[in-house]
Design a protein with these regions (language model features):
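Extracellular/luminal Protease-associated
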Residues: 100-103, 153-252, 320, 417-420
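Noncatalytic luminal/extracellular "stalk/propeptide" segments of secretory-pathway proteins
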Residues: 44-70, 74, 78, 90, ...
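Metal-dependent peptidase/peptidase-like ectodomains
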Residues: 253, 261-262, 302, 317, ...
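Cleavable N-terminal signal peptides of Sec/SRP-targeted secreted and luminal proteins
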Residues: 25-40
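Soluble metallo-hydrolase cores and metallopeptidase-like ectodomains found primarily
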Residues: 64, 68, 147, 151-185, ...
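Stable alpha-helical elements in mature extracytoplasmic
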Residues: 64-69, 81-89, 96, 105-113, ...
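Catalytic-core environment of secreted peptidases
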Residues: 82-106, 114-124, 183-187, 191-207, ...
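His/Asp/Glu-rich mid-to-C-terminal helical/loop segments that flank catalytic regions of hydrolases
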Residues: 337, 348, 449-461
Length: 461
């Protein structure tokens, strides 16, 4: 969990009672989608056996799963599986630690999970090879050297080039938007551009992190520093991916804390000249060998049909990756574990995929899609959990209107734990390839991410 997530939870203590509920949404939904086909948005009256199904039939079928729902909640909340996913995750992150793309730790994490899934008794557990980026940040620092000496909290962005060993020392130009940068293009030449953009939502504001270096390079800047993409801060910079363009010069780029960005903005507004020295030892190495991890519970009636649940195993290098995305990966595993422990056998194959190199732009997911897209008609729904796991509120869903109606019926079964909402836009980095080709998809939603990431689509507090 990031410092910003902790800060949010401090002001929302009344929600801690949902601790035992944090994974139930994903688990229930996984069971139910195995029992009937969403089938890429096909009409409701299509079924594998060719008989006519009405919406009323499907409503009644879903309602009949209430006893299964009770069994799952009893096992997960009160039974032997109580807190199991949390304990599994805690052990994993304590032993393995950060899991950066291309790192030895990620390799160890994949080996660990491969063995754990086999030991858990899941079926068809195997590894699928992937080539992934290998970038290391090295030593890095930033310092205001004029008008005072002040150390800047800084984290280089993934894939950034480094600076010369002596660093880059240059005057700063502070801007609040790309438009302002372009208006001041003449002033930006030879300077370090500092973005002090206004925070709207993560989805909108993250463009400054992704494109900040490119836009600054276009106007001749030497480097770019971006205010971390968050409305909350305890002088804690965030890292993340950024994207260069082939026809634009590459310049070093990093995120700085909200406090340091606003400090320089105040200085600049007074007309004070600001000079910064930036040092980054970042290096990019040849692509490394890695793997997506796959495990299944094979379907009893339509084994060729796939319901995919997923989370990514890699993380950034400056934390344990417990929430991004250890939590998502482990509740996805827990979904299969609960079904197996209860002796349930879904009609369709329930497939778990733990992605590699998501933080580098969904590399593992893209290669998985390319490998399996010829069988796309067999994928009934794709799911990922990468937006937090505590305090669930519902699902963000993308699919046909008829499929959405079915999802809403399923979610009614979660009323006892108050997880019933169905939001728009279920896209996620690792499932977008399938969704764009017409496969229904959803992402798990929780209170924090609704407020922090999706302000325009989630109103929950």
């Amino acid at each position: 969990m990031t410092a910003n997530e902790r800060a949010f939870l401090v002001v929302a203590p009344n929600y801690w009672h949902t601790k035992l509920e944090r994974r139930m949404n994903f688990l229930f939904y996984t069971v139910f989608v195995c029992l009937f086909s969403l089938n890429r948005g096909d009409p409701l009256n299509n079924s594998p056996n060719g008989y006519q199904r009405t919406y009323d039939n499907i409503q009644r079928e879903i309602a009949n799963y209430s006893e299964i729902a009770k069994k799952i909640i009893n096992l997960a909340v009160y039974g032997s599986a109580q807190n199991r996913s949390y304990e599994r995750l805690a052990l994993f992150v304590d032993i393995i630690g950060p899991r950066m793309s291309g790192s030895r730790n990620l390799e160890l994490a994949i080996q660990y999970m491969h063995k754990a899934l086999m030991k858990d008794g899941l079926e068809n557990v195997h590894l699928e090879p992937v080539k992934i980026p290998h970038w290391e940040r090295g030593e890095e620092s930033a310092m205001i050297v004029q008008p005072l000496n002040h150390s800047i909290a800084v984290l280089g962005l993934g894939g950034s080039i480094g600076t010369p060993p002596e660093g880059i020392t240059a005057e700063v130009l502070v801007v609040t938007s790309f438009d302002e940068l372009h208006q001041k293009a003449q002033e930006a030449q030879g300077k370090i551009v500092v973005y002090n953009q206004h925070y709207v939502s993560y989805g909108e504001t993250v463009l400054y992190r992704v494109r900040g270096a490119v836009e600054a390079a276009k106007v001749g800047a030497k480097a770019s520093l971006i205010k971390s993409i968050t409305p909350l801060s305890i002088n804690s910079p965030h890292t993340g991916i950024q994207a260069y363009e082939t026809d634009v010069p590459k310049i070093p780029t990093a995120c700085i804390s909200v406090e340091d960005a606003e400090l320089m903005a105040r200085m600049s507004s007074r007309g004070t000249k600001i000079v910064v020295t930036l040092k980054m030892g970042a290096k990019t190495y040849p692509d490394a060998d890695s793997f997506n991890i796959v495990a299944e519970i094979i379907g009893s009636k339509y084994p060729e049909q796939v319901v995919l649940v997923s989370g990514h195993l890699d993380s950034w290098d400056v934390g344990q990756g417990a929430m991004d995305d250890g939590g998502g990966a482990f509740i996805s595993w827990e979904a299969l574990s609960l079904i197996k422990d209860l002796g349930l056998r879904p009609k369709r194959t329930l497939r778990l995929v733990l992605w590699t190199a998501e933080e580098q732009g969904g590399v593992g997911a893209e290669q998985y899609y390319k490998l399996h897209k010829e069988n796309i008609s067999n994928f009934d729904i794709v799911m990922e959990s990468d937006e937090g796991t505590f305090m669930p509120t519902g699902l963000a869903f993308t699919g046909s209107n008829s499929a959405r109606s079915i999802i809403k019926e399923v979610m009614k079964l979660l009323k006892p734990i108050n997880v019933t909402k169905v939001y728009e836009n279920g896209e996620g980095t690792d499932i977008n390839y399938w969704i764009h080709d017409g496969v229904p998809g959803h992402s798990f939603m929780c209170i924090f991410m609704c407020v922090y990431v999706r302000k325009k689509t989630c109103i929950v507090i």
